[in-house]
Design a protein with these regions (language model features):
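Gly/Ser/Thr-rich active-site loops/lids in small-molecule metabolic enzymes
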Residues: 100, 160-175
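Glycine-rich phosphate/pyrophosphate-binding beta-alpha loops
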Residues: 32-33, 138-167
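Mobile late-domain/C-terminal helix-loop "cap" segments
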Residues: 177-217
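Phosphate-handling active-site elements
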Residues: 2-11, 162-169, 185-186
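Carboxylate- and glycine-rich phosphate/diphosphate-binding segment that chelates Mg2+/Mn2+
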Residues: 39-146
């Protein structure tokens, strides 16, 4: 396509300008965004701007999720991208849109993150943990087809500031506990299923647990 990349951004109406593309084969090298199963992408320009582009025409025809490609991912990026996957799973489940299959996929992804992200951070060569995190990332993106929430609304806005140089996953990790406390009175009994997926006791403070989880990572 001709013209500045910004012309194809979602906020500039680029979605309608993006036509059919050659078949895309996505090969992720992190476990967080889930872009390999989505029709969107983020391009960071030379001046630090983050351009969000999305279209059904960008949906990959094939995703090759090979955990071997994530074995060398540094601890900080393993943790940050993993928390991005967690935020996707939780926010997709909590959004008011009704989509039981997507909710179930998100909860399964959340269970994987809680179980395997600490292992992947502790030992980057843990292939089993890396595989489960790749699955969690893909599940998170499948689930958020039904929507996201305040965590991503804020992290995208803050992360777009080129002066901050803030990682999207790190922002999600920091914002998630506060948003969970804010949402608590408005989501009915959904936190009951969240606790079960996370292996927490009934009545446990999910926001506080995630704060501690962040510290451990």
């Amino acid at each position: 396509h001709e013209g500045p990349v910004a012309n194809w951004s979602a906020v500039s109406g680029g979605r309608s300008r993006i036509g059919p593309a050659p078949p895309i084969i996505a090969i992720p090298t992190t476990a967080g965004t889930g872009s390999e199963v989505g029709g969107g992408c983020v391009i960071i320009t030379e001046d630090g701007q983050k351009i969000v582009i999305g279209s059904p025409n960008l949906l990959p025809k094939m995703a090759i999720c090979d955990p071997e490609l994530t074995l060398g991912l540094p601890k900080t990026l393993t943790a940050a991208t993993g928390m991005d996957a967690m935020a996707h799973c939780i926010e997709a489940y909590l959004t008011p849109a009704v989509n039981p299959p997507a909710a179930a996929i998100g909860l399964d992804g959340l269970e994987r993150v809680v179980t395997y992200l600490p292992r992947a951070v502790t030992d980057g060569q843990d292939r089993d943990a890396r595989w489960h995190m790749m699955m969690a990332a893909s599940e998170g993106a499948m689930a958020f087809a039904k929507g996201l929430g305040c965590v991503h609304s804020m992290s995208h806005a803050i992360g777009a500031d080129p002066d901050l140089q803030a990682h999207h996953g790190t922002l999600n990790a920091v914002l998630l506990p506060t948003v969970l406390r804010l949402n608590a009175p408005h989501v009915g009994d959904k936190y009951v299923r969240l606790r079960r997926a996370m292996g927490l006791e009934e009545g446990a403070d999910i926001a506080e647990w995630i704060t501690d989880f962040n510290r451990q990572l």
